[in-house]
Amino acid sequence: MSASYVFEPNPITSCKIIDSKENFPVRRILCVGANYVAHALEMGRDPSREPPFFFAKPTDAIINADRGANTIIPYPPQTNNFHYEMEMVVTIGKIAENLEPDETSDVIWGYGAGIDLTRRDLQKAAKDKGRPWELGKGFDKSAIISSLCPVAKIGHPKEARIWLSVNDVIKQDSNIDKLIWSVPEMISILSKTMTLLPGDVIYTGTPEGVGPIVKGDKVSGGVEGIGEVSITIS
């Protein structure tokens, strides 16, 4: 007997896949903070290799925004300091529990490029009071993502340029080989803390150069060999 609900369930959130008519269903969005040394420094954090910390965004914050798709993102409410953070994104395709770093490659489904949009003033206010970041990070349309590249097509990138521009001016320009905690290490740590399941999406951190955007700005970015995104703020 099929279940009945008091109202119609929300549609499944999904990511597009390069050269495929299939979509990747999103279960959960996890993000790692301060995972590039230079970005940790610009945010006033100790860049030493202390254990990474994670936060979450709601699943339906995902917005597919491949470059050239003319994706419009509204300037969010309750902020006067709206920031971009360009990131490589990792997606999980198998159950992951209590894995060591060298056991993680088989659970990765693919990779993408994403922007972690942030209400920086709300995030800072929460940090100053030792409170969670949800109001600064987990708002509507805050998880921009490109079409995904399957591991079967690109393998596991260890080195790739990661960049972002605002109105064609480069603001972030680094390489994923500068991650403090590697993708295998991040997945290992998460898998020892919670069960990762197919559909989990992990934003792996942003390099230095984060900054504000305003209405009318065109923001583009990418991870070389993986994907590119583009949005316009309205």
Where do the PLM segments sit?
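Catalytic-core "active-site belt" of small-molecule-metabolizing enzymes
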Residues: 2-193, 197, 201, 209-234
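Switch II (G3) loop of P-loop NTPases
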Residues: 206
